[in-house]
A protein has these predicted regions:
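Membrane-helix boundary connector in multi-pass membrane proteins
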Residues: 68-72, 156-167, 174-189
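Central hydrophobic cores of alpha-helical transmembrane segments
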Residues: 50-59, 164-176
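Hydrophobic cores of alpha-helical transmembrane segments in multi-pass inner/ER membrane proteins
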Residues: 25-36, 82-97, 144-158, 191-207
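Juxtamembrane "helix-exit" motif on the non-cytosolic side of transmembrane helices
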Residues: 63-71, 123-133, 177-183
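Loop-to-transmembrane alpha-helix initiation sites
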Residues: 75-80, 182-196
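N-terminal topogenic module of multi-pass integral membrane proteins
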Residues: 1-71
Length: 224
């Protein structure tokens, strides 16, 4: 696969993005850290508040990163922006408006995976700083890849499991993961792992729900 821009152009773009918007990126990172700590503790954040944070992550990446910056070197970024806006709208509609999402520390086999992904997304700026020997010309926070990894972790702690909310994040794990090796962003090698984990988690939930439904339908009915 050949990208429509060079590695140098990509890292120059990241430098411009970080320089222009770093205060907002720090705020977004701090909000994500606080939400994660509260979710891990008994004082978990409001479900609507956490849904709103996920919506903010995706809408920010859509407008501030894809539309405002990435379109300068890649025309496909307009399509990416539309996908990210749609994902943000889905989180806002299902989680904030309708209150259909609930988040809590889970006690199952997926919980360790969820927390590793959340922790990795928060450490993502530091990992890139070490790997690239820079604090400016790197993907830091408020960009698509850590957004996807953070989202995957949080969704694994959500009820009910929603495969609809997982489609676009899993798609991005393929898109971003395929570009990671070409651009030399080794921190993004975690994207395919996060995508596979989220896909399996969501499909398992769909299978479990189907099994329950079939059990209810097949249960004998007795008339009084």
């Amino acid at each position: 696969m050949q990208l429509p821009f060079t590695t140098e152009q990509f890292f120059d773009l990241l430098a411009a993005y970080n320089e222009a918007l770093w205060p907002a990126l720090v705020v977004l990172w701090m909000a994500s850290l606080v939400a994660s700590v509260l979710l891990f503790s008994s004082r978990r954040p409001s479900d609507r508040w956490l849904s709103g944070l996920l919506a903010a992550h995706w809408i920010w990446s859509a407008l501030a990163y894809h539309a405002a910056f990435f379109t300068r070197i890649n025309s496909a970024a307009w399509a990416f922006a539309a996908l990210f806006l749609l994902q943000g709208a889905l989180f806002f509609w299902h989680g904030v408006v309708r209150g259909r999402l609930s988040f809590a520390p889970a006690r199952n086999a997926w919980a360790p995976v969820a927390w590793v992904l959340i922790a990795y997304s928060l450490l993502y700026p530091g990992i890139n700083a070490v790997l690239h020997f820079s604090v400016s010309r790197i993907p830091a926070f408020g960009v698509p890849c850590p957004t996807m990894i953070f989202t995957a972790g949080v969704l694994m702690l959500a009820k009910p499991r929603s495969w609809r909310l997982s489609i676009i994040p899993v798609m991005w794990s393929v898109i971003g993961g395929s570009a990671a090796s070409l651009l030399g962003v080794r921190a993004d090698y975690a994207l395919p792992i996060a995508g596979v984990a989220l896909a399996l988690f969501s499909l398992q939930g769909r299978t479990d729900a189907k099994t329950v439904l079939e059990h209810v339908q097949l249960r004998p009915r007795f008339r009084a």
